[in-house]
Amino acid sequence: MKMFIGELVALSMMAFALGMDAFSVALGMGLFRLQLKQIFYIGIMIGLFHIIMPFLGMFLGRFLSYQFGSIASYIGGALLLLLGIQMIVTSFKKESDRFVSPMGIGLIFFAFSVSLDSFSVGLSLGIYGVRILLTILLFGFFSTVLTWMGLMLGRHFQQWLGAYSEALGGSILLAFGLKLLFSF
Protein backbone atom coordinates (compact mmCIF):
# COMPACT_ATOMS: atom_id res chain seq x y z
CA MET A 1 0.00 0.00 0.00
CA LYS A 2 2.83 2.39 0.91
CA MET A 3 4.45 1.72 -2.47
CA PHE A 4 1.15 2.40 -4.27
CA ILE A 5 0.78 5.77 -2.49
CA GLY A 6 4.33 6.70 -3.48
CA GLU A 7 3.62 5.75 -7.09
CA LEU A 8 0.33 7.66 -7.02
CA VAL A 9 2.05 10.81 -5.72
CA ALA A 10 4.89 10.55 -8.27
CA LEU A 11 2.49 9.94 -11.17
CA SER A 12 0.23 12.78 -10.00
CA MET A 13 3.19 15.16 -9.97
CA MET A 14 4.15 14.02 -13.45
CA ALA A 15 0.56 14.39 -14.67
CA PHE A 16 0.50 17.88 -13.16
CA ALA A 17 3.76 18.73 -14.94
CA LEU A 18 2.37 17.61 -18.29
CA GLY A 19 -0.91 19.39 -17.65
CA MET A 20 0.97 22.65 -17.03
CA ASP A 21 1.89 22.73 -20.72
CA ALA A 22 -1.79 22.67 -21.67
CA PHE A 23 -2.55 25.14 -18.87
CA SER A 24 -0.01 27.67 -20.14
CA VAL A 25 -1.33 27.54 -23.70
CA ALA A 26 -4.92 27.64 -22.44
CA LEU A 27 -4.13 30.85 -20.56
CA GLY A 28 -3.41 32.46 -23.92
CA MET A 29 -6.57 31.03 -25.45
CA GLY A 30 -8.58 32.40 -22.56
CA LEU A 31 -8.06 35.88 -23.99
CA PHE A 32 -10.49 35.04 -26.78
CA ARG A 33 -13.49 34.84 -24.42
CA LEU A 34 -14.57 31.37 -25.41
CA GLN A 35 -18.05 30.14 -24.54
CA LEU A 36 -18.37 27.62 -21.70
CA LYS A 37 -19.36 24.92 -24.20
CA GLN A 38 -16.13 25.53 -26.17
CA ILE A 39 -14.08 25.49 -22.97
CA PHE A 40 -15.67 22.16 -22.04
CA TYR A 41 -14.88 20.56 -25.42
CA ILE A 42 -11.33 21.89 -25.52
CA GLY A 43 -10.61 20.41 -22.07
CA ILE A 44 -12.16 17.05 -22.96
CA MET A 45 -10.25 16.83 -26.26
CA ILE A 46 -6.93 17.64 -24.59
CA GLY A 47 -7.69 15.13 -21.82
CA LEU A 48 -8.45 12.39 -24.37
CA PHE A 49 -5.20 13.03 -26.21
CA HIS A 50 -3.36 12.96 -22.86
CA ILE A 51 -4.80 9.46 -22.38
CA ILE A 52 -4.17 8.12 -25.90
CA MET A 53 -0.66 9.47 -26.46
CA PRO A 54 0.96 8.21 -23.22
CA PHE A 55 -0.82 4.87 -23.67
CA LEU A 56 0.83 4.48 -27.07
CA GLY A 57 4.14 5.60 -25.56
CA MET A 58 3.86 3.12 -22.67
CA PHE A 59 3.05 0.29 -25.05
CA LEU A 60 6.20 1.04 -27.04
CA GLY A 61 8.19 1.60 -23.82
CA ARG A 62 7.20 -1.80 -22.40
CA PHE A 63 8.27 -3.44 -25.64
CA LEU A 64 11.64 -1.68 -25.56
CA SER A 65 12.12 -2.52 -21.88
CA TYR A 66 11.41 -6.18 -22.53
CA GLN A 67 13.82 -6.23 -25.47
CA PHE A 68 16.68 -4.16 -24.06
CA GLY A 69 16.46 -4.47 -20.25
CA SER A 70 18.26 -2.00 -17.98
CA ILE A 71 19.63 0.14 -20.83
CA ALA A 72 16.02 1.09 -21.58
CA SER A 73 15.70 2.64 -18.09
CA TYR A 74 18.58 5.01 -18.83
CA ILE A 75 16.96 5.90 -22.15
CA GLY A 76 13.68 6.66 -20.33
CA GLY A 77 15.44 8.95 -17.86
CA ALA A 78 17.28 10.72 -20.66
CA LEU A 79 13.99 11.27 -22.54
CA LEU A 80 12.38 12.85 -19.48
CA LEU A 81 15.45 15.01 -18.95
CA LEU A 82 15.41 16.24 -22.56
CA LEU A 83 11.65 16.80 -22.50
CA GLY A 84 11.94 18.88 -19.31
CA ILE A 85 14.69 21.02 -20.86
CA GLN A 86 12.61 21.44 -24.03
CA MET A 87 9.56 22.57 -22.02
CA ILE A 88 11.64 25.10 -20.09
CA VAL A 89 13.16 26.52 -23.30
CA THR A 90 9.76 26.60 -25.05
CA SER A 91 8.24 28.47 -22.11
CA PHE A 92 10.27 31.53 -23.06
CA LYS A 93 8.98 31.70 -26.66
CA LYS A 94 6.32 34.25 -27.53
CA GLU A 95 2.81 32.92 -26.94
CA SER A 96 1.76 34.07 -30.43
CA ASP A 97 4.37 31.73 -31.95
CA ARG A 98 2.63 28.71 -30.39
CA PHE A 99 -1.08 29.49 -30.82
CA VAL A 100 -3.46 27.32 -32.89
CA SER A 101 -7.21 28.01 -33.29
CA PRO A 102 -9.19 25.80 -30.86
CA MET A 103 -12.03 24.88 -33.26
CA GLY A 104 -12.65 21.95 -35.63
CA ILE A 105 -9.49 20.44 -37.08
CA GLY A 106 -7.49 23.17 -35.32
CA LEU A 107 -8.65 21.76 -31.97
CA ILE A 108 -7.53 18.25 -32.95
CA PHE A 109 -4.16 19.57 -34.12
CA PHE A 110 -3.83 21.63 -30.95
CA ALA A 111 -4.69 18.69 -28.66
CA PHE A 112 -2.25 16.46 -30.55
CA SER A 113 0.58 18.99 -30.39
CA VAL A 114 0.06 19.69 -26.68
CA SER A 115 0.01 15.95 -25.90
CA LEU A 116 3.16 15.00 -27.83
CA ASP A 117 5.20 15.43 -24.68
CA SER A 118 2.93 12.94 -22.91
CA PHE A 119 3.85 10.36 -25.57
CA SER A 120 7.52 10.77 -24.68
CA VAL A 121 6.77 10.56 -20.97
CA GLY A 122 4.61 7.48 -21.63
CA LEU A 123 7.54 5.91 -23.46
CA SER A 124 9.78 6.54 -20.45
CA LEU A 125 7.17 5.25 -17.99
CA GLY A 126 6.55 2.16 -20.11
CA ILE A 127 10.25 1.39 -19.91
CA TYR A 128 10.12 1.95 -16.15
CA GLY A 129 7.05 -0.34 -15.81
CA VAL A 130 4.37 1.82 -14.14
CA ARG A 131 0.67 0.94 -13.90
CA ILE A 132 -0.82 1.86 -17.26
CA LEU A 133 -4.47 2.48 -16.33
CA LEU A 134 -3.62 4.60 -13.29
CA THR A 135 -1.11 6.62 -15.31
CA ILE A 136 -3.32 7.42 -18.29
CA LEU A 137 -6.31 8.28 -16.10
CA LEU A 138 -4.19 10.68 -14.03
CA PHE A 139 -2.70 12.24 -17.18
CA GLY A 140 -6.16 12.70 -18.71
CA PHE A 141 -7.69 14.08 -15.52
CA PHE A 142 -4.93 16.58 -14.75
CA SER A 143 -4.64 17.84 -18.32
CA THR A 144 -8.42 18.28 -18.64
CA VAL A 145 -8.78 20.14 -15.35
CA LEU A 146 -5.68 22.28 -15.89
CA THR A 147 -6.87 23.17 -19.41
CA TRP A 148 -10.24 24.24 -18.05
CA MET A 149 -8.53 26.29 -15.34
CA GLY A 150 -6.20 27.89 -17.86
CA LEU A 151 -9.04 28.85 -20.18
CA MET A 152 -11.11 30.28 -17.33
CA LEU A 153 -8.23 32.22 -15.78
CA GLY A 154 -6.70 33.29 -19.08
CA ARG A 155 -8.28 36.72 -19.25
CA HIS A 156 -7.00 37.65 -15.81
CA PHE A 157 -3.57 36.08 -15.40
CA GLN A 158 -2.10 35.19 -18.81
CA GLN A 159 0.39 38.05 -19.00
CA TRP A 160 2.20 37.25 -15.74
CA LEU A 161 1.86 33.50 -15.38
CA GLY A 162 1.95 32.07 -18.92
CA ALA A 163 5.65 31.30 -19.42
CA TYR A 164 6.30 30.43 -15.78
CA SER A 165 3.69 27.66 -15.63
CA GLU A 166 5.28 25.75 -18.52
CA ALA A 167 8.75 26.29 -17.03
CA LEU A 168 7.48 24.79 -13.74
CA GLY A 169 6.16 21.74 -15.61
CA GLY A 170 9.49 21.36 -17.42
CA SER A 171 11.39 21.58 -14.14
CA ILE A 172 9.33 18.76 -12.63
CA LEU A 173 9.97 16.51 -15.66
CA LEU A 174 13.66 17.42 -15.54
CA ALA A 175 13.80 16.35 -11.89
CA PHE A 176 12.12 13.01 -12.63
CA GLY A 177 14.52 12.43 -15.52
CA LEU A 178 17.50 13.03 -13.22
CA LYS A 179 15.98 10.69 -10.62
CA LEU A 180 15.62 7.91 -13.20
CA LEU A 181 19.13 8.42 -14.54
CA PHE A 182 20.84 8.40 -11.16
CA SER A 183 18.77 5.83 -9.23
CA PHE A 184 20.43 2.80 -10.84
From Swiss-Prot:
Similarity field: Belongs to the MntP (TC 9.B.29) family.
Transmembrane segment boundaries: 8-28, 39-59, 68-88, 103-123, 132-152, 162-182
Membrane association type: Multi-pass membrane protein
GO CC annotations on file: plasma membrane
MF terms in GO: manganese ion transmembrane transporter activity
Keyword ATP-binding: no
Entry's localization field: Cell membrane
Originating species: Geobacillus sp. (strain WCH70)
Name this polypeptide is given: Putative manganese efflux pump MntP
